[in-house]
Curated annotation (Swiss-Prot):
There is a cross-link at K1416 (Glycyl lysine isopeptide (Lys-Gly) (interchain with G-Cter in SUMO2)). Residues 1417-1433, 1578-1589 have a biased composition (Basic and acidic residues). Residues 43-55, 1434-1447 have a biased composition (Basic residues). It comes from Bos taurus (Bovine). This is Protein RRP5 homolog. Residues 83-171, 187-258, 281-346, 365-436, 453-522, 542-611, 634-705, 727-796, 844-909, 1034-1107, 1148-1222, 1230-1298, 1324-1396 form the S1 motif domain. The lineage of its organism: Eukaryota, Metazoa, Chordata, Craniata, Vertebrata.
Amino acid sequence: MAAMEESFPRGGTRKTHKSEKAFQQSVEQDNLFDISTEEESTKRKKIQKGPAKTKKLKVETRQSSKFVREKFEILNVESLCEGMRILGCVKEVNELELAISLPNGLQGYVQVTEICDAYTEKLNEQVAQEEPLQDLVGLPELFSPGMLVRCVVSSLDTTKGSKKNVMLSLNPKNVNRVLSAETLKPGMLLTGTVSSLEDHGYLVDIGVSGARAFLPLQKAQEYIRQKNKGAKLKVGQYLNCLIEEVKGSRGVVTLSIGHSEVSAAIATEEQSWTLNSLLPGLVVKAQVQKVTPLGLTLKFLSFFSGLVDFMHLDPKKAGTYFSNQQVRACVLCVHPRTRAVRLSLRPVFLQPGRPLTRLLCQQLGAVLDDVPVQGFFGSAGATFKLKDGTLAYARRNHLSNSKKTFKPEAFKPGNTHKCRIIDYSQMDELALLSLRTSIIEAQFLWYHDIKPGALVKGKVLTIKPHGMVVKMGKQIRGLVPTMHLADILIKNPEKKYHVGDEVKCRVLLCDPKAKKLMMTLKKTLVESKLPAITCYDDAKPGLQTHGFILRVKDYGCIVKFYNDVQGLVPRHELSAEYVPDPESVFYTGQVVKVVVLNCEPSKERMLLSFRLLSDPKQEGEGQSQKKKKAVSAGQLADVKVLEKTKDGLKVAVLPHNIPGFLPTAHLSDHVTNGPLLYHWLQTGDTLHRVLCLSVSEERVLLCRKPALVSAVEGGQNPKSFSEIHPGMLLIGFVKNIKDYGVFVQFPSGLSGLAPKAILSDKFVTSTSDHFVEGQTVVAKVTNVDEEKQRMLLSLRLSDCTLGDLATTSLLLLSQCLEERQGVRSLMSNRDSVLIQTLAEMTPGMALDLEVQEVLEDGSVLFSEGPVPGLVLRASKYHRAGQELEPGQKKKAVILNVDMLKLEVHVSLCHDLVNRKAKKLKKGSDLQAIVQHLEESFAVASLVETGHLAAFSLTSHLNDTFRFDSEKLQVGQGVSLTLQTTEPGVTGLLLAIEGPAAKRTMRQTRKDSETVDEDEEVDPALVVGTVKKHTLSIGDVVTGTVKSIKPTHVVVTLEDGIIGCIHASHILDDVPVGTSPTAKLKVGKKVTARVIGGRDMKTFKFLPISHPRFIRTIPELSVRPSELKEDGHTTLNTHSVSPLEKIKQYQPGQTVTCFLKKYNMVKKWLEVEIAPDIRGRIPLLLTSLSFKVLKHPDKKFQIGQALKATVVGPAESSKAFLCLSLIGPHKLKKGEVAMGRVVKVTPKEGLTVSFPFGRVGRVSMFHVSDSYSETHLEDFVPQQVVRCYVLSAATPVLTLSLRSSRTNPETKSKITDPEINSIEDLEEGQLLRGFVKSVQPSGVLVGLGPSVTGLARHPHVSQHNQSKNAPYDRHLPEGKLLTAKVLRLNHQESLVELSLLPDATGKQDVLSAPLGQPPPKQEGRETEAVERNHEGKAKEKKKQKQKEKRTGKGQEGAQPPSKDKKEPQKPQAKKLGKRPHPESSSEQEIGNKKQKKAALSEEDDSGVEVYYREGEEAEEMSMLPKEKLTRPAEAPRLQLSSGFVWDVGLDTLTPALPPHGDSSDSEEDEKPEQATQKKKSKKERELEKQKAEKELSRIEEALMDPGRQPESAEDFDRLVLSSPSSSLLWLQYMAFHLQATEIEKARAVAERALKTISFREEQEKLNVWVALLNLENMYGSQESLTKVFERAVQYNEPLKVFLHLADIYTKSEKFQEAGELYNRMLKRFRQEKAVWVKYGAFLLRRGKAEASHRVMQRALECLPKKEHVDVIAKFAQLEFQLGDAERARAIFESTLSIYPKRTDVWSVYIDMIIKHGSQKEARAIFERVIHLSLAPKRMKFFFKRYLDYEKQHGSEKDVQAVKAKALEYVEAKSSMMDD
């Protein structure tokens, strides 16, 4: 029975007596919520009466379930009633009405007079004036599709077809009629319309009597900027308004329409909503009461109940709802009679003010096959799933043709049906379907399905004087005007047509928006086979069609076609004979046949003729010959395309339609453009200015080549051989190609031969390689034979140059691109959206794409283009070396559009995607990189800016052949001269290529870590390699050791040949940890065997068989085993290539390798196994010790021999082996390995990655041997952890971080043992676990990764035994609990637990009985406390979670009062009543928190600080507010880590004061207001004195000079008192930046620059640097450049350059930083600081070689006196950032030249102490104290030596240094005595 009672929603409709009705009505007015209580008690009494009422009870139960089903029925028109308030969405906007989408697929309409009273008044005023008003705008400007609106059903009109039209009203007076001025509260969300514009804001009509609403301008600015596009609000504009303040006495309401405030608005109990006043669109917090298949019942605002039907569940959470679940819901409608409230859980409704996404109507009317059923809901209907994944819905009456044929079993989930989309419901985000056969087979469903010119069938509905109405479907009506009932006018149409007759019509006009359809029944038009003209673009000259005369005038006839297209037949075209009076011959409505003479679509003008042209196919032969005489060779004419053939186009020569043929090759001068034009030309297209080449009996041969047309027009067309003489240059085309030469024909028909010998300046192997048939060429006549009518021609470029090659090149390029643009125009006329989109795409356009597939050749295919089906491709080169995966989002730039293959070539290159805005100059010479190649032109990108430019690959019509060596390649560098500075319609700049000598080699995209880049060449190897040698493999040679390096030894052989011995070829058995090269000494004679050689240029190790071995550096071996070897068995292994050799190494194999260096950037050790085999040891594979991983350079020495295990080829390059020093080559169960944290998932665990390419997961049960709720907070991404592999059975490893696993030898204490299965548990065992969830059956506690226990309700807490106890508030997921195992069920794997104190020995999990009110507090009524206890419990839980997260929480801290709203700005602080003082212990806790907050702030900056301050402010609100507002204790403005000017503005972190709301919550205010009326006179006097004291205290605070600035006015006062203090100005800027007010921060900076005195140069520079920082972070590159240029003008340029370089570096804009440093090196080449900073920059980026080159350049540019300092600086940098060995070499070289530079010695000593060993440090001290220096300097070094030994040495070492100093003093004294 309890369940039955819950099923009754609020507001039932059971029958009641009149007295009972009256009683309920009075109760509702007093306390609406007592009804449910009385009903429950009544029902309980009935139950208690005993078995006598059992039968009646069953009936009641059945009725109640039926009642629930009725309530869950979806809305229909019958369930609506007048006055019902409902939420809707604007679907369509027309001039006079709005179409509103309502829930459950309903639709209503709002008339233009139902917007608001002010708008209606404006309309009436406009009608009265008969002139449009300026301040009155139409509905399309006030409303847009997708807007959510609150409506009221104003009327339900019934049409003739018994269909109801739902008429709605948006007028606030109707919508908000249920509210009164007294019920308005701050925080309420209302809707209103703008009624007028005032000086300081807007008056808003909210429709509440007795209340006036005002919207201040500042509260509307955000909305105006974001939603209104900067325009002011208009009268009638619909707004979602939040009440900010209510002034009760005058009824004035202050509103806000800010997006953040409105979207966060939520209805609360404090706002005193009732069922009568509840408005649609309100967002409420609700609790799920019951879950049914049809939907949910919710409880909200404590007392109200509501329904959520299946359409309005959250699609992502459907099926997961459970009882007592807390959700947020939106009110959809409230029925005024039944009081039923319907709600929605869809996320889109939970943010008020957010518009709904507009559904695409492309498929509207589409018939779909095999659509599967997703769910069947009985009488409500069924849902279906479409192919694209979207949901669709069909009502019950649309599931079958009739009720009799309906079969419910046919709609089981998964069954498929044929259906048709009939509409879209935006409110439900669903497509509406119908399965009715009549609808599926209907020709048209909606007006937009009907196209002008289409044939349609319909039934006569009515016959009226103005025409006949025809019905063509359920929704479609059309009109046949009286004029169109027949070919001639009929007087009595009712005699010919009858109601119900089926008629066949042709559509004249269809306007879907206006639902206007006009048709014709004229037989000639209906049965016409001629093409119909439906738009002006269809009207091609020569087209014949039917139309009807609209008007007859003196000047001719106006003929109308379809879709309001009309044209004029001039008087002289009415007939072949003169027509004196057109009105006597023609009449209106007459059907006529016309031919199009001319049409201008842009002007909508068309010229027609009744004098029909003859069809050439039907002409007689004699007439045809007669017309052909009208065309002669050399004549220009327009042609119309008739048909396409294999080789060209069949055309008709206009105006006489003479048949002709236009070959494909003759469409263009450019060979590639001919097929392109042929492909896109269509039948009916007209080509202008076509040249007639020849006229024969069969056909007329035509040509469209612009070069030939220009030659004919220019008179360069000799018609006979007598007009031709040697030396003439003629333009023709290749007619035929033979082995011996090429025949060229000219426009007049003459032809000549170009022999092979003079065909080209280049050697001609095959004539067909140089020319193709139909190609346009320029020929020079070399010989003429008039008798034989022959001539010889030359096609060589040197003979046929027409002028400047550069000009010709540009002309050819322009012509080629212009023709391609013409092709785009042809494409844009096609119906296909794909082709139209391709036509609009031009090079240089940026696209946001998604990677679809990476092909085997390295190229990439993309999806997510502008239209589906578009092929977008990036070549391997244009991947720019990026690692891509399917689904990855990328930004790309279009390079070229292939209009034949319908492909778009794009590039991901960084320089192209991030194009720079720089002004270009015409004629400037620029470097460019070739990005794309076509046959006739190339597309290149300018190096400086990234702009795309096109340049011709040919400089002449004959210039078509290139040898392979001359051909350009993608990536090759070229020099271009710009001819245009702005890209035209083609999207490309035009340019001319410079000399070919300026071309550079192709820029290959290669891996940043290749063998070539890593190869470091020993300078000793470069010397002496010029000589050839006669050595061969196996020869034994002798030599002298020249130098010793860590991994190799350089040896000088006979005849000065240099050889090399690798560390692996010195000893047979190398002890681990030793350096083999140390065995050899400089000058020692060695005997070695030649085993290979290194190339002189590349220094790569070459195999034996290499042909250039005689010019290599011999590779030697001194290993005893190889020296004793007589044969070549050992040596033959060196003949294998390195890559093949690497493949021979097997994973798990142990090798000896030699450390070359530690790569700090890539975090690996680089080692050499052999001269040609190198490897990498990732840092995580070097050791299991965290100490070693932290400082690997201290553990491993360069040149040291290491034993390593082969893992496999390196991931980044197959030229390297991946090695490991910790043993295993693959991860398996039981292994311990080092990994790196990739992700930390709260309440779940960690994800860890390994160098082996594997990934593993660590459960929260395996993080530590002792559980903690916060132990996951100790981990951050990229942190190194030691892991134990528990399982490797799946691709994702199972790991453990427990010390008992990773360090078993430590024998650490195990507080919480591992629980992997139920077998690990025993009954009575005490253990700890984490709360997983709270279920109706009890609390689920996780005991291990796969073991979960259940604590049933009686075993959870001793305070409450109810099953419905809200434990989830007190036992959140992840909470750590101690439990006792009560029972184990091994068969069902069930574990029963107890959490009770007597079982666990711990405190009760619930500190107090649930539902018990907290202790009564001062100044509060008990009622308010009880009512708000639940809300406070939530706030307390949130606060505890925040304290846990930030690490600042303390036990016993007072939770804050329930906040009404989070303030948006830190400065927004209201003064109000002061709270009661708190206890001293709470104050101490607050002080601790404040100190912690201040400490944590020092290590952070920027935006993060801003948000942290927001959190701290919330926490500080827990402190006594008296303390917070005391000015003496207000926190001061703080700067993190000192004041450094070259850091970002975000490090300036003003410690803004906490912005807690000083007034109490609304719950506290109500009782105080109630008691305020009852105060005595004495109390009022005391209150007045108290208020005066508070006011004086505030005034004192404002006068305090040390007061913390809280607003812009405060900062203005400060900068007024100290105008030249940059610190204050920067704090002012930071204040604005933290509020994201970028423009205001800029304005402050500009004020500072104007205000600060010109004498304060440093202060001004500080502001300039801050402004640069601001523009770098928030501005564009252009704005940053402008500020930088200004800063350089007003400050010392070098300082500004250096600051900007640092800004770029710190913001990781390394490319910009590099470019800036290059500019600085050119401008400040005499400044050593620039060179040193650039060197440091490169070293930090890992570019050591580049840094070395910079040092060499610095020494060339700087004066000699600076050299030593620069060298020392670079050496210092090498020690710190680069190779320590190289740094030592630089210092040693410098000190050998300048041995008395004590400053260099001092720096060298510092570096050795810091980066070297103690042995090295003592060695250098020994050297320096034996130098011959001045005694004063020697004293300095002795003192340093002594200090060093005191710190690092023993007492013996200290005494030794003292003895040496004494010895030095005695020696000096004896010398002075002598």
